[in-house]
Amino acid sequence: MASQGTKRSYEQMETDGERQNATEIRASVGKMIDGIGRFYIQMCTELKLSDYEGRLIQNSLTIERMVLSAFDERRNRYLEEHPSAGKDPKKTGGPIYKRVGGRWMRELVLYDKEEIRRIWRQANNGDDATRGLTHMMIWHSNLNDTTYQRTRALVRTGMDPRMCSLMQGSTLPRRSGAAGAAVKGIGTMVMELIRMIKRGINDRNFWRGENGRKTRSAYERMCNILKGKFQTAAQRAMMDQVRESRNPGNAEIEDLIFSARSALILRGSVAHKSCLPACVYGPAVSSGYDFEKEGYSLVGIDPFKLLQNSQVYSLIRPNENPAHKSQLVWMACHSAAFEDLRLLSFIRGTKVSPRGKLSTRGVQIASNENMDNMESSTLELRSRYWAIRTRSGGNTNQQRASAGQISVQPTFSVQRNLPFEKSTVMAAFTGNTEGRTSDMRAEIIRLMEGAKPEEVSFRGRGVFELSDEKATNPIVPSFDMSNEGSYFFGDNAEEYDN
C-alpha cells in the first residue's frame, strides 16, 4: 500500500481520534458499541418489547432507522420548509412487530424526533455520538449490498451491471463522514462523481457563484477520496486529471468509467468492517458485558465472537428459506457481499450460495405485506473460523469468473487468487486510447494485461480457529477452483429502490 503512513487507520476515522494506540482505539470503538447497546435497551423498554421481540431483526432495523432519521438535520430542515400532507416533520417511526395471541402483528409507532434524540444522547453520555450513527448506516449499507444488485443505478450512469463488485456502500447517505468514505467501493465513488458532472452539464449555474464554490470543493474532495483508493500511479494520475478539469464534462465521465472498469483488475483499496444490528449489541450490554472496558474491534475476532453467542430472530415469509435468510444477514454482518463465495463457505463452515439461488427476499417487510402467514425463525450467524478484514484490494491476477459479476472485492485478508474474467474486462478496453489521458490509459491497459492468473493475494494470510484470539496459527484454506466464486452470478436479485 502506498502512503500507508499518512492514512489514518479506520478505527481512527471511526473515533475521530488523531494518533491513538491500539488499546485506546479498542476502548473507543467499545464505547461506541456500548452507546448503541444502551440506546437499544432503552427503546425496547419504551416500546414494551419482550426479549424475543427485541431480538427480532426487523424491529432492530426500525429502531435504527428512527434514530438515523431523528439526526438527519438536512432532511429535517427540508421537511420543515416543504411540508407535505400527512407527514409530520417532527415525528419519526416505523413498523414494530409483536407476538399477539400466537401470531405476529404489525404496529406502526410514531415518536417525536426530539424524544428519540434525547434517548440516544442519554445512552451516549450526553454526546451526539455521530460515530454510533455512522456505524448503523454502514450496517444498513452492508445489508443493502448483500440484498440488492444495483443494475439500474449502474446502467443509468453509463456503467456496466457486471461491475457490481465495485459498488460497496452505494446506498450510504452523504453524511456518513470519513468512516463512510472508507467503505465506499470504486464504483460508488465514480457514480457519485458522474451524477455530479451530469448535473453540471444540465444546469449551467451548478459550478457558479457562492454555492458553486462549495460544489467545486466537494467535487475535488470526492476525486481525492477516489484517488486514495487506487493503488497504481497511472490510475491516480488519471484522477488528478479529472479533479483539475476546469469544466468537468463528458471527457471526465469517460475517464471515470475507464478507471472504474480498470478497477475490476487493478482493484482499489476499500475498507471492510463488521457492523452488526443494534439487537446484537443491546442484549450483550444488558447481560453486563462492558465493551469499553473489554475493548472491541470491527476488523478482528470480536464481531465473530459476539455473533457466536447471540440469538437473533427474523420474520420469514411463507415461501422463504430460513437458512437462506441467515446467509444473507451473515454476509451483511461481515460486509462480504463482494467476497469470493468459496472463501466465505470455508469461513462460515456451510455452503454460501450465489444471490440468485437464495429463496429469500430482503429482510425488511413492506407495509402492504400480509402478516397472516408470517413465521419467525432463528438466524444462524455463527462461523467455523474467523479472519481479519482487509482494506486493500489484494494484488491482481486472474481466474475464470461468472457471467453476472466479473470480479471480486476481497473482505478478508486470506491467501487466495482473486477471480476475474480477464477477456471480458479487456474487451471493454479496445479502441479509445486517444485524448489527453492517452498515456495513462495505455499504461493502465498495459498493467491489466500483465495481471497473471497464478499470482496469489494476501500471501501467507489465513483464517483462524475461534479459540485462536491472538491470531497465532493461520490456516491457509484450499479451494475447489471449479466452483462459482461470484455472489451476483448472472443474477436476478431485486433492485434496490429508495
Curated annotation (Swiss-Prot):
The UniProt entry, under InterPro entries, shows:
Flu_NP (IPR002141)
Where does the motif Bipartite nuclear localization signal lie? 198-216
- The residue numbers the entry assigns to motif Unconventional nuclear localization signal are 1-18
Q: Name one GO biological process term.
A: symbiont entry into host cell
Q: Which GO terms describe its molecular function?
A: RNA binding; structural molecule activity
The region called Disordered is annotated at 1-21
Gene Ontology cellular-component annotations: helical viral capsid; host cell; host cell nucleus; ribonucleoprotein complex; viral nucleocapsid
Query: What modifications does the entry list under PTM / processing?
Result: Late in virus-infected cells, may be cleaved from a 56-kDa protein to a 53-kDa protein by a cellular caspase. This cleavage might be a marker for the onset of apoptosis in infected cells or have a specific function in virus host interaction.
Entry keywords, A to Z: Capsid protein, Helical capsid protein, Host nucleus, Host-virus interaction, Ribonucleoprotein, RNA-binding, Viral nucleoprotein, Viral penetration into host nucleus, Virion, Virus entry into host cell
Pfam families, per database record: Flu_NP (PF00506)
Q: Where in the cell is it found?
A: Virion; Host nucleus
Q: Where is the composition biased (Basic and acidic residues)?
A: 8-21
| Entry keyword RNA-binding | yes
Family statement drawn from the similarity comment of this UniProt entry: Belongs to the influenza viruses nucleoprotein family.
> What is the stated purpose of this protein?
Encapsidates the negative strand viral RNA, protecting it from nucleases. The encapsidated genomic RNA is termed the ribonucleoprotein (RNP) and serves as template for transcription and replication. The RNP needs to be localized in the host nucleus to start an infectious cycle, but is too large to diffuse through the nuclear pore complex. NP comprises at least 2 nuclear localization signals that are responsible for the active RNP import into the nucleus through cellular importin alpha/beta pathway.
On assembly, the entry states:
Homomultimerizes to form the nucleocapsid. May bind host exportin-1/XPO1. Binds to viral genomic RNA. Protein-RNA contacts are mediated by a combination of electrostatic interactions between positively charged residues and the phosphate backbone and planar interactions between aromatic side chains and bases.
What is the protein name stated in its UniProt record? Answer: Nucleoprotein
